Amino acid sequence: MRSSPWISILFVVSAGLAAQTAAAGPQEDVAAEGQKWGTVFADNNPETMTALYAKDGVLWGTLSPTVRSDPGAVKAYFVAAFQALPKATVKFGDQLIRVYGDTAVNTGYYTFSYTKDGETKSIPARYSFTYVKDGNDWKIVDHHSSAMPAPAAAPAPAPAATAAPAAAPAPAPAR
């Protein structure tokens, strides 16, 4: 019995897709958690945001100088954030993801965008998320976010070198 070349092609393609699916690993899972955080943030729901954090998760948020170290405080932060930045969205930039067994760190930058008084505004910020594996989920145990600082000013030029004063002439020898 002769098999169709289409069956062979289909087999090769499906095997390749299965290999790609199997290749997804912890780094991709952590990247997906970052995207999930951004999607949930855009929903402006403090309860859902808080659920992404571990019970002992810590948040140093962009909009507050206060560290939040329990679920009630994390939720209060997002209640205030969603009032301050109505209908805010976040777009992730470059991410550096490192996975150490059941712990992962995602460091990078993101930009918050929102509209207030008819004007679209943005806040570029840098972040670090630390995750711990909890069953099949990654939970945030530490999240630091701070507004991106303004670029440093160029250093002032060094003062121009001045010539040293001429040495006084040596006294004439006595005669």
Regions found by a protein language model. Give the residues of each.
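Positively charged n-region of N-terminal signal peptides that target proteins for export
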Residues: M1-P5
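Bacterial N-terminal signal peptides
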Residues: I7-A18
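Short, low-complexity N-terminal intrinsically disordered segments enriched in polar/charged residues
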Residues: A18-K55, G72, P151-R175
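A solvent-exposed, acidic/Ser-Thr-rich amphipathic alpha-helical stretch
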Residues: Q27-E33, P46-Y100, K121-S122, P149
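Hydrophobic/aromatic beta-strand elements that line small-molecule binding cavities or substrate pockets
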Residues: F78, F92-I97, Y110-F112, R126-V132
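A short, structured loop/turn motif at beta-sheet edges
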Residues: I97-A104, E119, Y131-D137
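A short hydrophobic beta-strand element
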Residues: D102-F112
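Short beta-strand edge/turn micro-motifs at domain boundaries
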Residues: P124-P149
